[in-house]
């Protein structure tokens, strides 16, 4: 017999009474008492709940009585490309989670104690019928705002693609979503970016590109001969335009100074997947789906090279021959900076001023940043740093800065 449990944040008596009605002879269990909530890109503020509201519901759960599991007690960080997403009925329907999973939990992203933690400790002790020896609390980690460092090298978009190994390149007559690509020993691509490239398309001065019978999952950037033709993403209203999941059969004007044979690149970023919902929710193939046609001036473009950009640690660490930094950025670019460390401490990158992308420290993927917020920092735990030289690589899609700035506090957004 399965033990049914409850998930909620408010109205504990109503929820637990309903649970007891379904299984009167079973113990009450709250499998997820939501201590806060996660944040999504484009939201105006960092989600929080008050200590008073949190404490009130927690005490009422234990008083009912029922057992409880906090979601979250410590949220931590969505390192790499592993952030999840939510869905909703209203626009924009799909909501990608930010990299920080601070969640306004009793322990912060860095493991620091909060007033919620102390309230939780007090309430649990009050209702604990068994005398328990409580160990000493671990010492809070020291945080350091290292001095800003200059960006010293870059690789342009074509240089990046030239460094992708043959086993991550696929020839296909039509476009294919990343999960079906014959990469990773035939297991497909799960995360990152996928590039659809055609080296010889005939472009007119005012050519039009159309995604027929499909859309982008989740964001598409179009380039002609390495020059970006799609706008920088800054607002949710743009999600209704060409380049995103909201609008099928969207069109883009490829305004060009001249006509001729060009290299067409369509770079698609997987923003993260949803892990719950109805059956239809779980069709979460990323990139450009099968049966999608790419039309240039109403003619289908066929014969693609599909390149998997997975940013695995070994590949990031292998990058070399960095060129000088250019002040004019026309396409997604990799940037290099070097941090000298005497003693590693926890720190944060302050990514305000950058556009959208991901950061790697000594090959480790810290996760995504995005100027849309609400979060503008990336957490670097001390164990990811080493005494001496640390290499920081930034993959920026839109707008770069000349420096990387550190802070000793997270920038999670207005509360």
Language model features with spans:
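Carbohydrate-binding surfaces of carbohydrate-active enzymes
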Residues: 31-36, 60-66, 73-303, 311-323, ...
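Aromatic-lined ligand-binding clefts that engage carbohydrates, nucleic acids, or primary amines
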Residues: 207-225, 264, 339-362, 369-370, ...
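Short, surface-exposed tryptophan/glycine-enriched loops
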Residues: 123, 248-263, 335-342, 377-389
